[in-house]
């Protein structure tokens, strides 16, 4: 039946209908189950967490993404710009390649590309963080003085009682901020009536002229909650009478982020900026699904209430920064270039045994600049401009027609480590397939799973075959498929790892997908992919939809990797322009 559904279009429709009930049932039971959007960051492997790497394997290790020299990393923490340096703290296991022994590792950079690792900034050492120093944020106070707030664990697993602590630099004149002090009056925020084992990840604070305010993520049964706290001096905090926002059937909210966005233009705003036309973004990382969701809405500063716009779906069906392997993200305002920058973590999709063997696990994705789409409904994301410093050999293609079933290789670049940016066009929208209304009840990845890159369509599938072997035994397709409904077009974007590796066992190879809110009246759409050995970060329609995949090819590695442009729709596709660059490694990557 599966083979028939995959190859026969009419059977596909039947299979979709038969799966609707199953999908609904699966969701009901998924609230407390990890469905591996990203694997749990706090999953414990006691027998592995202190197994230090002897040899670091380079196969599948990224060439230009942020990684420590070895071992495990997860959440980005407290990013900021201070005295000419970008600072990134991150959850790190100095003793092994799985989660455990977590400290706040610390790296600095002048350009967000080249990084120098310093000594860990925060590590368990006092009663208020004896059993762990978990995620948090940085705030720059008046006078340019940074302060970190983080979650401390005060009882051992499985209880993991959580409190909120602060730390300050030992020397404000040190631009490297090499040493941090944890004052003895910690913790400064304790759970009272809140769930103390689900109470973590304080946000960057904002100032309303009288009070500093932060959010702490939590839950009450299946309701996700953003608790709000106020302080006049950043030391004594009082919980507000009501949360800033909450939502039923979403489970634990962790790694919250809350910040303003300008209604027009691409510049970012300081976290404390408010105004009549200013929109706000609330992002939550859902522990139950391992995906992140955000809404765009209005912040009532006087009453400390956030209300998502009517056009912004609140909950598990809402907008995501990234529809793939992307979690625990954190933004910060860069005052040097007046932009808001997004950091996100991508975990591995292989086995824990693989991670221990190769000696490392986890990467931080390329930082992205964020701004509000002119339509006001969603964010646009784009790799920071500094990534262009790593571009090498360039190849250009233009006015190239792709007929049904054709694929063309992009030659002349290192396909295992490349930046590929293309604009596609088509003469007509008439051949777009009809979108069955019942499919709206399915997640986009279900549609992608059944209607993949090899299933003949009308307008699409078309896009890239990344990290591909010469004979296509392995490849990770990133592509669009255009559907039509009675009143509009619906664009599906996919990054499908099912054929990414001939390795049969131990790998998680899912299809990831999201819909693209884009105007196709000019019959054009763009696609950009950052390819780096075991990661493919893709940006559809100039960053309106983003998808990250982690893949582990067995054949398509190093010089045996290829990248193709393909079309498997009946409508001919034109490559208006395509530029591809070989990507060099940074000169400095955490002392590696």
Curated annotation (Swiss-Prot):
GO terms (BP aspect): carbohydrate metabolic process
Alphabetized SUPFAM superfamilies for the sequence: Arabinanase/levansucrase/invertase (SSF75005), Concanavalin A-like lectins/glucanases (SSF49899)
Name of this chain's protein: Beta-fructofuranosidase, insoluble isoenzyme 2
Intracellular or extracellular location(s): Secreted, Cell wall
Main location: secreted
The entry's keywords: Cell wall, Glycoprotein, Glycosidase, Hydrolase, Secreted, Signal, Zymogen
InterPro entries membership: ConA-like_dom_sf, Fructan_Metab_Enzymes, Glyco_hydro_32, Glyco_hydro_32_AS, Glyco_hydro_32_C, Glyco_hydro_32_N, Glyco_hydro_beta-prop_sf
GO terms under cellular component: extracellular region
Cysteines joined through disulfide linkages: none
Signal peptide: 1-40
Classification via Pfam families: Glyco_hydro_32C, Glyco_hydro_32N
EC number(s) recorded for this UniProt protein: 3.2.1.26
CDD domains: GH32_Fruct1-like
Keyword Signal: yes
Function: May play an important role in phloem unloading and in stress response.
Family (UniProt): Belongs to the glycosyl hydrolase 32 family.
UniProt catalytic activity: Hydrolysis of terminal non-reducing beta-D-fructofuranoside residues in beta-D-fructofuranosides
An MF annotation (GO) of this entry: beta-fructofuranosidase activity
Positions glycosylated per UniProt: 171, 195, 310, 347, 568
Gene name for this UniProt entry: INV2
Organism: Daucus carota (Wild carrot)
Active site: 75
Domain of life: Eukaryota
């Amino acid at each position: 039946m599966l083979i028939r559904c995959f190859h026969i279009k009419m059977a596909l429709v039947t299979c979709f209908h038969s799966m609707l009930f199953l999908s609904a049932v699966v969701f009901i039971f998924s609230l407390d189950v990890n469905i591996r959007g990203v694997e749990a960051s706090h999953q414990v492997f006691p027998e592995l967490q202190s197994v230090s790497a002897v040899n670091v394997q380079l196969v599948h290790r990224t060439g230009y993404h942020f990684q420590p020299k070895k071992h495990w990393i997860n959440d980005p923490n407290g990013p900021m710009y201070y005295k000419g340096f970008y600072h990134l703290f991150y959850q790190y296991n100095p003793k092994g390649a799985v989660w455990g022994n977590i400290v706040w590792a610390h790296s600095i950079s002048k350009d967000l590309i080249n990084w120098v690792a310093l000594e860990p900034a925060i590590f368990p050492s006092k009663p208020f963080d004896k059993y762990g120093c978990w995620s948090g944020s940085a705030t720059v106070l008046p006078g340019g003085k940074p302060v970190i707030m983080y979650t401390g664990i005060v009882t051992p697993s499985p209880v993991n009682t959580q409190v909120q602590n602060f730390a300050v630099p030992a020397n404000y004149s040190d631009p490297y901020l090499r040493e941090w002090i944890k004052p003895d009056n910690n913790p400064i925020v304790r759970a009272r009536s809140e769930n103390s084992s689900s109470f973590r990840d304080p946000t960057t604070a904002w100032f309303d002229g009288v009070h500093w305010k932060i959010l702490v993520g939590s839950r009450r049964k299946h309701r996700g909650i953003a608790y709000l706290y106020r302080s006049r001096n950043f030391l004594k905090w009082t919980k507000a009478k009501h949360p800033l926002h909450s939502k039923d059937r979403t489970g634990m909210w962790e790694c919250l982020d809350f910040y303003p966005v300008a209604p027009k233009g691409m510049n970012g705003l300081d976290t404390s900026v408010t105004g009549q036309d200013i929109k706000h973004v609330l992002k939550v990382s859902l522990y139950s699904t391992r995906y992140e969701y955000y809404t765009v809405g209005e912040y009532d500063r006087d009453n400390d209430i956030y209300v998502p716009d009517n056009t912004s779906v609140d909950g598990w069906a809402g907008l995501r920064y990234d529809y793939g392997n992307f979690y625990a993200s954190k933004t910060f305002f860069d005052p040097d270039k007046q932009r808001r920058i997004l950091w996100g973590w991508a975990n591995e999709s292989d086995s824990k045994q693989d991670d221990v063997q190769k000696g490392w696990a986890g990467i931080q994705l390329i930082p992205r600049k964020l701004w509000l789409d002119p339509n006001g409904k969603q964010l646009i994301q784009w790799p920071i401009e500094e990534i262009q410093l790593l571009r090498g050999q360039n190849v250009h293609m233009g006015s190239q027609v792709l007929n049904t079933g054709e694929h063309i290789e992009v030659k002349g670049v290192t396909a295992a480590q490349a930046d590929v940016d293309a604009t596609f066009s088509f003469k007509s929208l008439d051949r777009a397939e009809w979108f069955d209304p019942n499919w709206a009840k399915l997640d986009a990845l279900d549609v992608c799973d059944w209607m993949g890159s090899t299933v003949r369509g009308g307008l699409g599938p078309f896009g890239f075959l990344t990290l591909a072997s010469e004979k296509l035994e392995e490849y990770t397709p990133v592509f669009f498929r255009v559907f039509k409904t009675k009143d509009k077009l619906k664009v599906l974007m996919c990054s499908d790892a099912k054929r990414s590796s001939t390795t049969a066992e131990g790998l998680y190879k899912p299809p990831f997908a999201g819909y693209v809110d884009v105007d196709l009246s000019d019959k054009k759409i763009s696609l950009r992919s950052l390819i780096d050995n075991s990661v493919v970060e893709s940006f559809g329609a100039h960053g309106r939809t983003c998808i990250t995949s982690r893949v582990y090819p067995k054949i398509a590695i190093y010089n045996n990797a290829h990248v193709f442009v393909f079309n498997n729709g009946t409508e001919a596709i034109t490559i208006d322009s395509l530029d591809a660059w070989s990507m060099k490694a940074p000169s400095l990557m955490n002392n590696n």
